[in-house]
Amino acid sequence: RSYKRNNHKMDADGTEHQKSEGYTTLKEAEKRKKEIEYKQSLGTFVVPKCTKVKELIKEYVRIYGHNEWGVATYDGNIGLINNYIIPTIGEVQLSEINNHFMEKYYSDLLKMPAVKSSRNPDADKLITAATVHQIHKVLRSCFRQAVKWDMMDRNPATDATLPKYKAEEREIWTAEMLMQAIDACENKWLKVAFHLAFAATVRIGELLGLTWDCVDISEEAISENRAYVFINKQVERVSKEAVEELDSKEVILIFPSQRKNNKTVRVLKTPKTDTSERKVYIPGFVAQCLIDIKKEQDEVKEALGSEYTDYNLIMATTFGMPINGSYIRDQMQKVINKEGLPDVVFHSLRHTSVTYKLKLSGGDI
């Protein structure tokens, strides 16, 4: 059995508003009645402007998301909202949502098919516990804002029990495996990517965003063992919608699309946090790899003239555009298949790097 209470409030113009709230027990309904009566006696009770989840989500994105999210976070959260939140609970009244509702919702999600994507091309997989945790993170933040805006009295996601999940442990290469891959590598871009991932512990987006003004590979620097790369930006593919909606300060430039109908663009952007900016010293042989790249690039620029679009990128195509991360990953997969190495992702090379440095330093890095 459920219990309902109708709340009445007069606007400044004399218009009366009625809002219905549902409760699972009479005790909850009576408690809420006392809270409302107390707030009304103080003149602080305000009928929320948003009554449904979809209305709240819209306000949340417009006010909070546009101010707090970067373009990549916007893409991820909007995907969760459009795929899993609005279609399932968008029409639900805010007054009906409590801890019990949230726990049942999370449980029900695990029985629903996941939306078709690059990771689920055949749309034959169910929503995972990991995705439910991501959805919970968005809703918890959304409901926190609703409480702050006096649209809800409490956050129903705060104490909700989530489905258990264990993060998948991915295999990583040993330093010896990475050296084997480098020795077998015939692609110059993959080779320099391997070297920088290991020596400078860079992510693939940071690698693609490296520019010549952020390295010191001079003869003097190399001879004194102080050649370095300074990591302060990255290349990332994001939706055009995110760029247009956010007008984000983190975006330094937008690379031109090679296809007119693309829904995504590549951008050069600042890192996620200030702590991601770092100066990393590199060995002389890695500096020499960059010198060779620079020499070849300068020759291409001279030959092409105005046809070369100079973004000052280290990892640049023949015409100056940033190299695609997918190209690096494809080349890496060829080496993996050829050498029979464990099937790892490029990001795992950072863990290989950190593990090796910890071993060398005895845990002091």
Q: Residues of each region from the PLM?
A:
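N-terminal DNA-binding module of tyrosine recombinases/phage integrases
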Residues: S2, M10-K104, I293-D310, M321
